[in-house]
């Protein structure tokens, strides 16, 4: 399973949801949805905007987490 680390990265940079929404020019509700559910599907174009706003590579925004059934 893929888990988005956007919240972790943003919080480490002292960036809240509202600020990230403005910086990335992404709708606040989209950011909030990602914040609340890091396993949700997100368009690549949205991830590109968020990565640019956070100053990271798009590959830094996610991690692979083993499914519970694989454990």
Indicate residue ranges for each PLM-predicted region.
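Short alpha-helical DNA-recognition segment
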Residues: 15-33
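Short, charged recognition helix plus adjacent turn
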Residues: 8, 33, 62-71
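Residue cluster at the C-terminal edge of the helix-turn-helix DNA-binding motif
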Residues: 23, 41, 52-53
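The alpha-helix within a helix-turn-helix
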Residues: 10, 21, 51
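A short, Lys/Arg-rich alpha-helix, primarily the initiator
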Residues: 1-16
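Helix-turn-helix DNA-binding elements, focusing on the entry/boundary residues of the two helices
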Residues: 17, 44-47
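Hydrophobic micro-packing sites on short alpha-helices
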Residues: 46-51, 61-62
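DNA major-groove recognition helix of helix-turn-helix
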Residues: 10, 24, 35, 46, ...
